Structure formats: structure tokens, C-alpha cells
Amino acid sequence: MHRYQKEIVRLIKLSTPVLIASVAQTGMGFVDTVMAGGVSATDMAAVAIAASVWLPSVLFGVGLLMALVPVVAQLNGSGKSKKVPFEIHQGVYLALLTSIPIMLVLYNAGFIIAAMDVEPELYEKTQGYLHAVLWAAPAFLLFQTLRSFCEGLSLTTPAMIIGFIGLAANVPLNWMFVYGELGAPALGGVGCGVATAIVYWLMFLTMTLYTFIAPKLRRVNLYENWNKPQRKEIYRLFKLGLPVALSIFFEVTLFAAVALLVSPLGSTVVAAHQVAINFSSLIFMIPMSIAVAVSIRVGHKLGEKDLDGAKVASYCGLAFGLLMACCTAILTLIFREQIAYLYSDNQEVITLAVSLMLLAAIYQCTDAVQVVAAGALRGYKDMNAIFKCTFVSYWIVGLPSGYVLGMTDWIREPMGVYGFWFGFIGGLTTSAILLTCRLLWLQRNPTRIDMEVDELQIMH
């Protein structure tokens, strides 16, 4: 029991800075939503629809780079930290290469919005946001590369501090570009995209400065000898991260596709849906931060070839994540009306958002289990299993069931946006079951785990 208690303490110490950093980053979305809503419901809806294109695109790149965390953690755990700079340098090249297609997708995303038959004003504002925020993509991915470097070495505080710097900068920049203060143009919701691009470049430059001067990182010497791009190594990182990227993409696009599918239902429905989704994203940062900590701990233990320790870390993470989810679900049920008032003063938006947050509270527990289980599997480098489980859960179960319930009369009268939220519940519950079963199976087959650890050591 004492071993489990010590592991939970380690997870809390690792996950708390990750949580605060993630909340700060997600808080930027909260600020964008609130400040755009201060202009009009149309501007608020434009930010929501644009985010449904921007986030899946850029988080696909983040997923590719998340493979660096267990790689760095295992090298550090096995006493081979001198090989870390080479991996990070190749990660930088991968980030730059990945940002190019992401920027092209964002620039040409207008046809996706037009296909949803939205109002002309909403279309123009959404496209304007995307054309502004596309310049954030390279900075976002480069920042993620350096963040993975720090987190793989169990240094989770730097991203937390820099996340707050970004959030603090986002508010005045939004104030300038949304409302036209200090001589800046009044761009409304489009101004949120301009502010976001500036903020992510600021965060990347700040993280670069930290990794250059931090005493704790001197032993690694990240910038002493810069490695040239190695095609085979970049491809290996891409291949390792692709299942993670696709699994994140499938989850995010489940929510993004719903935002697009409900857009013909009107700005009020889109705005209420955005309120509930944005708050759910804030709450999701708690189990997500625990998942990052579990991935680090499992990777580190595998580097030490301590398979039992890796198992303890994953079990503690699942228990802790589920406990926190139960607490947040209860708080959401109690305070959902007050929360909705933070986002909007439109009574129709508030009424619908309150009912949607009731459904959000229901799926928080299974959402926590699935994300922590996926974090443990990332630590085991069992990336393909994550990809398969999430694909089935989100695109075979979640989205189709949501569409059938929400937009057709095959089962009952169309439920509108509520049907899609029941689809969320079904998809996330399926994901939790499949990923947990896979984790338990993997831990009962230690030969498979030993092979993966040995493979890592051979490659390096």
C-alpha cells in the first residue's frame, strides 16, 4: 500500500503543473469565447466553428510529437540522456514539416464551412479567423516539441509557467484586436485568431529561452551540437507518433464534426453547444494531465526495466483519474447554471447550455478512464492499440449514433444537438472499455513489454 501512496504522490507532483499549463492553454479558448461573445452571438459562433477546424488540424501535429515524451522518458530512465538532443532535433524538423500541410488545410478550409450552409456573415468571420490563426501552427508545434523534451525529463513546471504567460498575453491582445483598442482594427471574432497567433509565437520563444539557460537542462546540452535532419529518424518518429496523432484526431474530430453538423440549427444552438464543449474541455484537462504524468512514469519505469513499477503507475493513475472525475461531475451538476452565465447573458443560450452540461457531467467518468488508459499505453509504446480503439469508439460508435439520434427519425423523432451528446457518451464509454481491456491484456503479457523495451534500446 505504501508503494501505491508514493506513486500517487509522484503522479500528483507531475500532473499538477501539466494541469495548470493545460488549463491556461484551454483558458485561451475560454477567453476567446467570452470576448467574442461580447461582440455578438455570430462572432461567438464563428470562433466555435473555426475552432472545430483549427483544433483537429493542429492537434494532429501535437499527437505526432507526443511520441517524444515516452522516448525521452525511457532514455532518461535507462541512463542514456545524452542521446536525448538527437531525438529532439529530429522532432523540431518533424514539427516544421508537419506545420506546412496544417497551414494549407486551414487556408483552404472555406469550402468545409460553405458546405455546412451557414449564414454569409458567419462564414466570413469563420474564414477570417482561420486565415489569421494558421500562422500559429509552426509556433504551436515547435513549442510542443520543447514541452515534450522537458516533460520527458519529468520537468513539467516550465510549460505551466509559460502557459500562464500566454494566457496573460492573450487577454490584452484580444482586447486590442477584438474591440479595436490602442489603434488596432476592431476585428471581432477574427481578432481572436490574430491574438492566438501572436501568443503562440511568444510561448515558443519563451520556451526556447528557458531550455537554453535552465541549469537543470545543462547536463543534456540540447543546443551544444545541433544535429542535421536524418530522414530515417524523422520517419521513425513520424511512424511512432502517427497512431497517437490519429487517435487524437479521431477524438477531436468527433467533437469538431458535431460542431459543424449542428451549425445549420442556428447561432443559438451553436453558441450553447460551444459553451458546454468549452467547459467540458476545461474539465478534461484534469484527467489529461494525469494521463501525461502516467505516460512519463510508465516510460521511466520501463527504461529502468521495472515492469511491476510501470503497472503500479498505471493503476494509480486510473484510480486517481476516476476519483477526480467523480468530483468534477458532481460540481458540474450543482453549478452548471452559474457556469453558463459566465459565458453568455443570452437566456436562450444559457437554457440550452445548462441542459447540455448535464450530459457532459455524465460522460466525465468514462472520459477520464479512457484518457488515462491511453496515457499508460503511450508509456508502454503500444500506440497502434490506441489508434484502433479510438477509431472504433469515435467513428464507428460515437459519431454515427449521434447523427442517427440527432438528425434522423430512424429510432425516434430527431433530438437535434441532444442526440449528438448522447453519441459522445456512447463513444467515450466504448473507448474507456476497449483501452482498459487492452492495458490489462498488455500487463498480463510481459514478454510483449520486454520486446518493446529491448527494441527501443536497440534503435538507440
Swiss-Prot record:
GO terms for cellular component: plasma membrane. Keywords: Antiport, Cell inner membrane, Cell membrane, Ion transport, Membrane, Sodium, Sodium transport, Transmembrane, Transmembrane helix, Transport. The keyword Membrane applies. It is a multi-pass membrane protein. GO terms for biological process: sodium ion transport. One of its GO terms (molecular function) is antiporter activity. Signal peptide: none annotated. InterPro entries: MATE_fam, MATE_MdtK, MdtK-like. The chain crosses the membrane at residues 18-38, 53-73, 94-114, 126-146, 159-179, 185-205, 242-262, 276-296, 315-335, 349-369, 391-411, 415-435. Coiled coil: none annotated. Belongs to the multi antimicrobial extrusion (MATE) (TC 2.A.66.1) family. This is Multidrug resistance protein NorM. It comes from Aliivibrio fischeri (strain ATCC 700601 / ES114) (Vibrio fischeri). The lineage of its organism: Bacteria, Pseudomonadati, Pseudomonadota, Gammaproteobacteria, Vibrionales. The gene is norM.
